[in-house]
Amino acid sequence: MDNTLPPLKRIAAIHDLSGLGKCSLTVALPVISATGVECACIPTAVLSTHTGEFTGWTFRDLSDDMLSIAHHWQRIGVRIDGVYSGYLASPEQAQLLAQTLDCIAAPDTLVVIDPVMADNGSYYSKIDDRMCAAFRRLLSRADVITPNVTEAALLAGLPYEPGTHS
């Protein structure tokens, strides 16, 4: 009888880490782990809080670390079954994410991109049209995209219409 278990599925979560607030890697990591899937994290930034509800937050951009982490995983032969990306700290990080995908994603890796940038008709703090353009270029790399209504309108170049959406 063979008692070996199949290898654990692994998702790379590429997202910010907000110290306070129900968002970012603080939510993704436990949810992914609870499904029995290993969550391998590449943080894009560390914030004291998320930017939507709080003011005066601290912010550390981790752009310089993203590719280093991906290259390390590549060197040691880490298999990534899925990628989930969320908040990016800058438009330049969209290009870093594309390079990270080149490094860690196999042809059969499911890539889910959440273009986190806006809600209720407005961009989040420190985000503008440059970020939207960067996401437009990046989304061609995704198998699945998960914009909210505001993000979908911005990405499509359509006006946001407030109200109840289904």
Where are these regions (language model features)?
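Charged/polar interaction segments and conserved charged motifs
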Residues: M1-D2, E151
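Conserved phosphate/ATP/ADP-binding segment of small-molecule kinases
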Residues: S125-S166
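Conserved N-terminal subdomain of the carbohydrate kinase-like
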Residues: D2-I113, M117-S125
